[in-house]
């Protein structure tokens, strides 16, 4: 038995494992990948980007005349193109760090390209390549979610907006995918380091106070925050793990909880798979002989938020 000097018989508590300090936020390595662009409009936009985009569009005030719009991190063009249909005299400047994404956007723009639609490949972080007070409306659908420094990006969006112009952004809030994280937390029982990393990861998702703090720091006025949750349905664990939305998105962060412990990661994800499958097959069975037992989907909640504000006059 180990003892503390001067205190015979007192046992020394075993040091608890400590998680390494959080690493600086890293950009999604798939963000500029052509494989992501190839499936974005078919597999990701309908269930992810479009619900956020509709929320954004609902908060944009009407524009009259030859307004100049800016869409930052425009992906494949929407909802910026929707704004153009609302504003027949406006022109749209849209930027995104992904060349393959912009190639899709160019095809969708059709004859409007270089007439009312102007697309540019730009990193977007940490500074936008535009003069101050240049745009009548500035939007970013999920741009803050994809930014490694969202508070700085919001400041840039404010800087390039004209005095009095509206700035409208969307992003998911803390609590998104809560059902999955609850299951994962259970599977991490006894893995203290991974549990600490998971806690840090969950805290990295912004809450309402965080977003309001970003808006205040950016100097925005008339701040309104609308929260409109929606749900995603997955047929089971395999459908979840291999859904492009997950595979090219948060799966990277989930794997990073295990650092280089590939064996531990595999064990946890296999156990998690089995637990999800168990949940999906626990639907009430119909009377014998009528039809096979029904499965129920895995439901994940997305806490979608839209920040609408204006640059002060």
Please state what every model-predicted region is:
Residues 3-64, 78-82, 86, 101-104, ...:
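Conserved class I S-adenosyl-L-methionine
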Residues 35, 39, 224-294:
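C-terminal helical/coil "lid" or tail adjacent to the Rossmann-like core of SAM-dependent
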Residues 68-127, 152:
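Class I SAM-dependent methyltransferase SAM/SAH-binding core
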Residues 127-138:
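A short acidic, Gly/Pro-enriched loop at the edge of an enzyme's catalytic core
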Residues 136-150, 171:
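A short SAM/SAH-binding and catalytic strip from SAM-dependent methyltransferases
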Residues 151-166:
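A short glycine-rich, Lys/Arg-flanked "PGG" loop and its adjoining helix->strand segment in the class I
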Residues 164-236, 248-254, 303:
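Conserved catalytic/acceptor-binding region of the Class I
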Residues 242-244, 302-313:
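Core SAM-dependent methyltransferase catalytic element
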């Amino acid at each position: 038995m180990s003892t503390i000097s001067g205190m015979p018989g007192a046992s020394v508590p075993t040091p608890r494992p400590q998680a390494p300090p959080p690493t600086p936020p890293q950009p999604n390595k798939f963000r500029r990948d052509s494989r992501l662009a190839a499936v974005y409009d078919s597999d990701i936009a309908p269930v992810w980007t479009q619900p956020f985009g509709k929320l954004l569009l609902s908060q944009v005030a009407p524009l009259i005349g030859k307004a100049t719009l800016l869409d930052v991190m425009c992906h494949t063009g929407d909802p910026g193109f929707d704004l153009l249909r609302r504003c027949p005299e406006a022109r749209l400047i849209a930027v995104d760090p992904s060349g393959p994404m912009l190639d899709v956007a160019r095809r969708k723009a059709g004859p409007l390209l270089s007439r009312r639609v102007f697309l540019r490949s730009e990193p977007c972080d940490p500074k936008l390549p535009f003069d101050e007070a240049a745009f009548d409306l500035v939007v970013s659908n999920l741009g803050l979610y994809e930014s490694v420094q969202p508070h700085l990006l919001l400041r840039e969006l404010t800087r390039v907006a004209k005095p009095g112009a509206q700035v409208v952004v969307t992003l998911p809030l803390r609590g998104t995918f809560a059902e999955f994280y609850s299951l994962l937390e259970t599977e991490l029982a006894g893995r203290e380091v991974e549990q600490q990393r998971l806690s840090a990861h969950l805290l990295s998702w912004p809450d309402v106070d965080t977003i309001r703090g970003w808006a205040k720091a950016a100097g925005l006025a008339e701040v309104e925050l609308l929260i409109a949750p929606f749900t995603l349905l997955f047929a089971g664990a395999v459908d979840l793990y291999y859904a492009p939305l997950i595979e090219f998105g948060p799966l990277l962060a989930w794997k990073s909880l295990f650092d280089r412990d590939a064996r531990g990661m595999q064990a946890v994800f296999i156990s998690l798979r089995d637990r999800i499958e168990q949940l999906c097959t626990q639907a009430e069975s119909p009377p014998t002989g009528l039809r096979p037992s029904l499965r129920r989907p895995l439901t994940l909640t997305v806490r979608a938020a839209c920040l609408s504000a204006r640059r002060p006059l």
